Amino acid sequence: ACNFQILMTSITVAKFGGSALGVEGAMIPKIIDRIRQLQQESKVIAVFSAPLIEYNNKASSMTDVAIHVGRSYAASTPVEIEVLREIYERIASKYVADSRRRQEFLDSLDKFYRQVIISLKQAAENRRFVDVIRSRTLAYSGEVTMSYLMDYVMQGAGIKSSHVLIEKWPIITDDNFEAANFMVQESRQHSDHLIELAEHSDVVSMGGFIGRTVDGLETTYERGGSDRTAADVAILLNDGYDVKIDLEKDSAVLSADPRIVKDDLEFIQYLSYNEAKLAGMFGMKILDPIAIKEIDDNDLDIPIVITDMARPGAVTMIQRKPPDGGNPIKIVTGKKNCSMVRMESAAASHLVASLEFDRQYHDFIKLSPYRVDDTEMTRLLFLDADYVRRHERHIRAYYPKADIVYGRGVVTLIGDEMWRVPKIASTASSTVSEHDINILNLDAQEETSRILIVVEDKGSSVADAVKAIHSTRKKIRGA
């Protein structure tokens, strides 16, 4: 038999977030340089977030500004809306020198801005800034507009680029407008335009965070959703191309949050999907954990690279099964503002099914059960106490006597290989106790690659516990 291998075209799906773009697009020249570097190895699909803007004396995402404007209109206290347009005019005048290209972009901007005005009028009439009114406003004052603009910037820089037309958007979602769910089959049926652009261009520009329903209504993912867009685009292209995802951030992955821990920080070269998903859930801003979940759910193995934009040589590679080695405790992370919910296990299983399948909500952890008399009880640790506050009635509908406790924080040790280290849980817990931090709960299960320590979220207790455990990480390593 003839043994030959078809060489697939390589594509890098590179995501540039708001901080990568900078205030008023100040970092655009660096992004162009970076895209040129990526181009040397492969074609590029560049996924852009909305830029940052100086607003009310602080740097804010255009998404936050648009939400502020929309809510003001809904509350009948309209504010200046030109801000949603003018930033793009300023960026275009600075970075698109060719007058024909600039005019072409400004024509699109006019069209988008009209959509924003119509949506804001509807928000004022309905006294609500929700659903498609919200997602349409965000799309046309944020990611979609920025992706069109970046195409013209790249063309002006001599790059053979194109942009995905919003009318032919490949990311198809359900109609959960503010926290949409990716629909892979429907998206595949709408991906011809994207594939055609990828075939005929070196770089394709596309907006993150935004989806469309089958019948063409704009939707958004939850905040941080541009990571998901990059993952979803990679899923759509994976059959026909050799795809990798490159998330351009202000740092590669470190062993703890550098804002909390200053000493002995270690650069993490490899993470598994599982480790990265856990780290994202438990407070490390690596990437949106749902992005990995979507790749996982589709049973794919697409490499994800986290690149430090300032030092592109510093990368963390995330794979389904990374090579072994290094400290078995990859990351120590902390999360404030958590909530503990206790209820009978039978009721808890129904609540969990409702959250995961009906509401597509996954931001909680089921801890080890315990018994009261003859009844098995379950503890659910919610990683966002505000969600519990908003949905207390829904939770109590499953178990009226549910015990709901707020003011909890969680410190998590993460590593698929931690089970190899003897006494790791007891060392971690005694370290925390030595710092006079009261441990309310410890949950360590070999199969889960995590050790959770629940503490009171009071003052700097979570940060102190992270520092304490991280300082023993080197000692535990070879214990």
Regions found by a protein language model. Name each.
Residues 2-287, 444-447, 453-457, 477:
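Nucleotide/pyrophosphate-binding catalytic subdomain
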Residues 12, 202, 243, 269, ...:
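Structural beta-strand/beta-sheet cores of well-ordered domains, especially the beta-sheet scaffolds
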Residues 33-37, 195, 293, 430, ...:
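Surface-exposed alpha-helical segments enriched in charged/polar residues
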Residues 51-52, 251-253, 308-313, 347:
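Glycine-rich beta-alpha junction loops
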Residues 274-308:
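Phosphate/diphosphate-binding loops
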Residues 287-289, 307-317, 388:
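Surface-exposed amphipathic alpha-helical tracts and adjacent flexible/coil segments at the periphery
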Residues 314-479:
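A conserved regulatory-domain signal marking ACT and ACT-like small-molecule sensing domains
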